[in-house]
Amino acid sequence: MIMNKMKNFKRRFSLSVPRTETIEESLAEFTEQFNQLHNRRNEDLQLGPLGRDPLQECSTFSPTDSGEEPGQLSPGVQFQRRQNQRRFSMEDVSKRLSLPMDIRLPQEFLQKLQMESPDLPKPLSRMSRRASLSDIGFGKLETYVKLDKLGEGTYATVFKGRSKLTENLVALKEIRLEHEEGAPCTAIREVSLLKNLKHANIVTLHDLIHTDRSLTLVFEYLDSDLKQYLDHCGNLMSMHNVKIFMFQLLRGLAYCHHRKILHRDLKPQNLLINERGELKLADFGLARAKSVPTKTYSNEVVTLWYRPPDVLLGSTEYSTPIDMWGVGCIHYEMATGRPLFPGSTVKEELHLIFRLLGTPTEETWPGVTAFSEFRTYSFPRYLPQPLISHAPRLDTDGIQLLSSLLLYESKSRMSAEAALSHPYFRSLGERVHQLEDTASIFSLKEIQLQKDPGYRGLAFQQPGRGKNRRQSIF
């Protein structure tokens, strides 16, 4: 009798003292309870109206009876059989959320997903994966809220938006579809290239939404672009910041060129910058995948001010050096605060180039006289001028790098990969060369922007609003 009293006392005492439970124990208990309820529901569903088990009734029916081999069951039958066998686990939720992009879903959404959407025990097929993403909200226009109109171009309108899934800001590039022509080739090209580019210095394509009337590209949102940055620092950048932006530009471009992709439209408006100072290549509408060392392309590419002389003269055979000339022009513009060759026509653009670098000859540019445009224009014989007199804020290494990019003969221009190792960037340290592709240069504590001498304040916040946003991503 005394033993019974002791047992009752221990039981009451244990019930009166709250028990500390670990997160792992709570999750394990939750999982077990869910599985019990799930199995009980399956048992109820499996019992027919007369208390019979429909699976037992069907057990005498084999796949071979219908002429189907076991491996040839319809997807619906296979799915139903897996439904009756699957169990929920926390690992399933993790697998379900292994998305092809860096995304953080709200906690309440994860809880809802745990309760309502258990996963299959086998790895998801491509079709199932797409269906899974669609269930979450990807590929649906209603997932995004339009906030401000950033600009409008010939084929597209760009909006600042917000994702209902993550609450993050996004840029919605809405491309109008003409029923006679379908999606513009520039949009198709941009999507096909960007979906395979994962780099810290290349804008991320988060989602793609296709409706009858439009094709919407959902990009990560960045507050400003390089042109706006220059405007808001009074066109007077810190030379340290010039170096950091230049390194990021080359880093993203080297990644593209390594994958045989030419951007073909480099300009400050297409280099987006966020509040952290991360610079990212954007607007791949004119970009091309290059499968051979040289190939014939259109010469109507690259904004006039950043177009290399060989393309200006009508060359349609080019490779990665087409982008490197533009890099040189952008480097000069950051260092001086003004465009290097602001021509309004092709002839004027060539005139400005020749006046600074000297009129080319067969000795300085083999094959130049073969261009009919060069013979037709009959340019004066200009002598080359020293670049240091036009960009005095650049140090010796900076001038040497600039000179190696602004070369007439395209094959002689320094590559993006080689430029990253130029002595000009030595002051950034060695660790910048050891970063993973998706790691930001600012993940290194020694890399920080300095205050620009001409800084006017709010350099990042104001440009991204309303009509002041440059129409740079159409």
Curated annotation (Swiss-Prot):
Modified residues (Phosphoserine): 14, 74, 89, 98, 117, 132, 440, 443
PANTHER family noted in UniProt: CELL DIVISION PROTEIN KINASE, CYCLIN-DEPENDENT KINASE 18
Class of the enzyme per the UniProt entry, highest EC level: transferase
Natural source organism: Pongo abelii
GO cellular component: cytoplasm; nucleus
Role, per record: May play a role in signal transduction cascades in terminally differentiated cells.
Lineage, highest ranks first: Eukaryota, Metazoa, Chordata, Craniata, Vertebrata
Keywords per UniProt: ATP-binding, Kinase, Nucleotide-binding, Phosphoprotein, Serine/threonine-protein kinase, Transferase
GO MF term (any one): protein serine kinase activity
Catalytic reaction(s) noted: L-seryl-[protein] + ATP = O-phospho-L-seryl-[protein] + ADP + H(+); L-threonyl-[protein] + ATP = O-phospho-L-threonyl-[protein] + ADP + H(+)
Active site: 265
Disordered: region residues: 44-87
Similarity field: Belongs to the protein kinase superfamily. CMGC Ser/Thr protein kinase family. CDC2/CDKX subfamily.
Database matches in SMART domains: S_TKc
Residues that, per the record, bind ATP: 150-158, 173
EC number: 2.7.11.22
Superkingdom, taxonomy of origin: Eukaryota
Alphabetized Pfam families for the sequence: Pkinase
SUPFAM superfamilies named in the record: Protein kinase-like (PK-like) (SSF56112)
Record domain Protein kinase: where: 144-425
Name of this chain's protein: Cyclin-dependent kinase 18
